[in-house]
Amino acid sequence: MVSSITRIQNYVIDGAATSDGLATVLESNFAPSLISLPATPLFGTDGIRGKVGELLSAPLALQIGFWAGVVLRSHAGQLRPVILGQDSRNSSDMLAMALSAGLTAAGLEVWYLGLCPTPCVAYLTSVSEAIGGVMISASHNPPEDNGIKIFGANGGKLSQALQAEIEKGLRGNLPITSNVSNCGRHYSRRELVKDYGEALKRPWQNKVNLQGMKVVLDLAWGAAVGLAPSVFAEMGAEVISLHNAADGDRINVNCGSTHLEMLQAAVQEHNADLGFAFDGDADRVLAVDPTGRPVNGDYILYLWGLHLKQQNQLPDNLIVSTVMANLGFEKAWQQQGGKLIRTAVGDQYVQAEMIKTGAMLGGEQSGHILCSHYGMTGDGLLTALHLASLVKQSGVSLAELIDQSFQTYPQLLRNVRVVDRDRRLNWQNCTPVQQAIALAEKAMGDTGRILVRASGTEPVIRVMVEAANAELANYWTNELVAQVQQHLAP
């Protein structure tokens, strides 16, 4: 008797697979559930993410690997490898091996990189023969969380349509059975990470070096350990490293891009020119200037965009950012003759808008920066090297560049923990919260902004208020947080 999985494999192997045809095969082969999935969508703004042992498990990773393999093969129409990497979390080995088992059960070859940044997976996927890439990481989340990010053959985040196909297969929960003739193989390809490191330095070869610069790097006990310090040193910088070891118990704990305090102190203590803080998978970065002042993604986009504009290299003087971008950034960029397009929060939305509009530069306030000249995913190391080179070429300090850029509107962001997933994702149905938002928007008019949204990566509702002064921002933030806590997080 031919198993359901074998029938699906044969359908894809035959080379006649189409999206509609695959859906028909999936629907005709559904079986009783083997894993428990939430009623709400599994994919968030940055892949699949959750607490290990609750949402994420080895059986789920196995299923995700298999269905990702089936969908990727159905759209590629041929057998090519999948590139797989991971961060330093204790659970990453388990999830990576389970996911690799699923991919090989789908008949695909796996090239395993081991510990590496997320943009390393994206880059190697885009320049190799790979059919796609997968990264095991929960980015800036705490050690007990983990996640699965899937990339297409171009190195960009997988489209929502393909994510939906994978989730459709997952919700069928077919038992995974395979046979020797259909299995793929798992190969260790750790040497490829060096190719990514060389690619990072390539834009500045024989043009710019960082000699004479002192740089502090906070590696957050994560995926950039070792690699980032070596790349900066090879570019000529004097490097001081913080949290530069792979530590699954401490990744992101009071360090990295969400906790700049130690980096700020170290930059001032060592009289460094600038500092960079990466998150756990190094797809984002925030900077610190010589005075210890934080430099977020808005400033990085402005400085990088202005440099490109002055070189006549920025198409339509366009930058893509999100609804979180500060009004001060937007107004200053407009005064420079530039245009800013806002998207929903999430680099996948920034990526989609960049593709749609032909924009070269985009990103998020949180430090995800995308430049289509180099690829279509956020790259913390590449962004850090660009900012450092801009400072070196300018002949002035990062502090002076920031002083000359723009003044931000006071902006407060508060996170309210809402454990109930359904209540969190459907918060818009809460009338008291909507009424409070309407009242605040009416009171501030066009001198402020309010953004309330469910996080796509954490069990929280984010409340952001931007106002003409700090007192107004603080007042309305407190009012809205109180309503969310009372009605959504009792």
UniProtKB/Swiss-Prot annotation:
UniProt-annotated binding residues for Mg(2+): 139, 279, 281, 283
UniProt-listed InterPro entries: A-D-PHexomutase_a/b/a-I, A-D-PHexomutase_a/b/a-I/II/III, A-D-PHexomutase_a/b/a-II, A-D-PHexomutase_a/b/a-III, A-D-PHexomutase_C, A-D-PHexomutase_C_sf, A-D-PHexomutase_CS, Alpha-D-phosphohexomutase_SF
Phosphoserine carried by residues: 139
Assigned GO CC terms: cytosol
Entry GO MF terms: magnesium ion binding; phosphoglucosamine mutase activity; phosphomannomutase activity
Primary role: Catalyzes the conversion of glucosamine-6-phosphate to glucosamine-1-phosphate.
Cofactor, free-text remark: Binds 1 Mg(2+) ion per subunit.
Similarity annotation: Belongs to the phosphohexose mutase family.
Positions annotated as active site in the UniProt record: 139
Pfam families linked to this entry: PGM_PMM_I, PGM_PMM_II, PGM_PMM_III, PGM_PMM_IV
UniProt EC number: 5.4.2.10
Name of the gene encoding the protein in the UniProt record: glmM
Catalytic reactions of this protein: alpha-D-glucosamine 1-phosphate = D-glucosamine 6-phosphate
One record GO biological process: peptidoglycan biosynthetic process
Keyword hit for Isomerase: yes
Keywords assigned by UniProt, alphabetized: Isomerase, Magnesium, Metal-binding, Phosphoprotein
PTM annotation: Activated by phosphorylation.
PROSITE patterns: PGM_PMM
The protein, known as: Phosphoglucosamine mutase
Species for this entry: Trichormus variabilis (strain ATCC 29413 / PCC 7937) (Anabaena variabilis)
Names of the cofactor(s): Mg(2+)
